[in-house]
């Protein structure tokens, strides 16, 4: 038995903020944003919706998809850099709201790579038999830490949440290999003071290199090649970074997720939101080999090779 995904769910806020809306707020244009980022619109949570709320909505759907009740969950992991407050953790707030009375709970802070860290952590508990069912959530309300006067960052981010229930799956399914990494010397290029601060040029160079290299390495660890890949779900940070990852694996455009056009960069929620979108679109099938890869502040990165199915 391996550790895999047995249920998925996502939540995005109702409010849509388009590039044309941003034109009225700052010195920018739809053409400038689309050309440099690939983003056309993003979702923004209402003032009375916080990270824990979005996490709850996504988690409920993942549990329903898995055909499970909250009391069946042994551990809750929430990847976020925008908790409602420093403590209690979003995971503990989620545990109470779901009624997951048997679950331990903690948050993970690895920025946009957080969901990869969460999935890999969950897999270790499942593989060792310590826990059987684990809820992994990526949720961020980046709008509350975005400087809406800075056109270099304000155009990039959106809000949302994605969740998966992980548990034992059939042999040959689930996570086949993974890589996690960090380079603390790059922390100065992407961080939060009052708002998000980013050295776009340095982050871009790091992301283009690391996304492709990590994807290739997890394939090698699993004894697979680029020809074996059926679908790529990269962190949705910038369409040029996404495209670089696709080219590194030599995949056709129809085999990569590009949800950034509709949602922008949703940080830890990016990969699980994309996973649900592509499943609903019928682009991922049983026994497909999927590569998930992300990077974030820290600097951090993570990649997973996963055989889809239970």
UniProtKB/Swiss-Prot annotation:
Homodimer. The active site is at 112, 235, 265. InterPro entries: ACP_syn_III_C (IPR013747), ACP_syn_III_N (IPR013751), FabH (IPR004655), Thiolase-like (IPR016039). Pathway: Lipid metabolism; fatty acid biosynthesis. The gene is fabH. It is an enzyme of class 2 (transferase). This is Beta-ketoacyl-[acyl-carrier-protein] synthase III. One of its GO terms (cellular component) is cytoplasm. One of its GO terms (biological process) is fatty acid biosynthetic process. It is found in: Cytoplasm. Belongs to the thiolase-like superfamily. FabH family.
């Amino acid at each position: 038995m391996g550790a895999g995904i047995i249920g998925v769910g996502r939540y995005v806020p109702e409010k849509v903020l388009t590039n044309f809306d941003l034109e009225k707020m700052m010195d920018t244009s739809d053409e400038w944003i689309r050309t440099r980022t690939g983003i056309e619109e993003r979702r923004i949570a209402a003032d009375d919706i916080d990270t824990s709320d979005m996490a709850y909505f996504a988690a409920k759907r993942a549990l329903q998809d898995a055909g499970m009740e909250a009391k069946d969950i042994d551990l809750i992991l929430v990847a976020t850099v925008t908790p409602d407050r420093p403590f209690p953790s979003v995971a503990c707030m989620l545990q109470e709201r779901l009624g997951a009375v048997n679950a331990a709970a903690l948050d993970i802070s690895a920025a946009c790579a957080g969901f990869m860290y969460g999935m890999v952590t969950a897999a270790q508990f499942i593989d060792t038999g310590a826990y059987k069912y684990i809820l992994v959530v990526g949720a961020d309300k980046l709008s509350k830490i975005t400087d809406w006067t800075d056109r270099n960052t304000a155009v990039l981010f959106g809000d949302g949440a994605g969740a998966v229930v992980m548990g034992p799956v059939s042999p040959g399914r689930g996570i086949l290999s993974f890589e996690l990494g960090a380079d603390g010397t790059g922390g100065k290029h992407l961080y939060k003071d009052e708002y998000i601060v980013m050295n776009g040029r340095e982050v871009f160079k790091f992301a283009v290199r690391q996304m492709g290299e990590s994807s290739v390495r997890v394939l090698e660890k699993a004894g697979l090649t680029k020809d074996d890949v059926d679908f790529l779900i990269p962190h949705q940070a910038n369409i040029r970074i996404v495209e670089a990852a696709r080219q590194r694996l030599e995949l056709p455009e129809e085999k990569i997720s590009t949800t950034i056009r509709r949602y922008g960069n949703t940080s830890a929620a990016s990969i699980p939101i994309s996973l649900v979108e592509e499943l609903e679109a019928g682009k991922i099938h049983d026994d497909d080999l999927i590569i998930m890869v992300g990077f974030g502040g820290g600097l951090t990165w993570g990649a997973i090779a996963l055989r889809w199915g239970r």
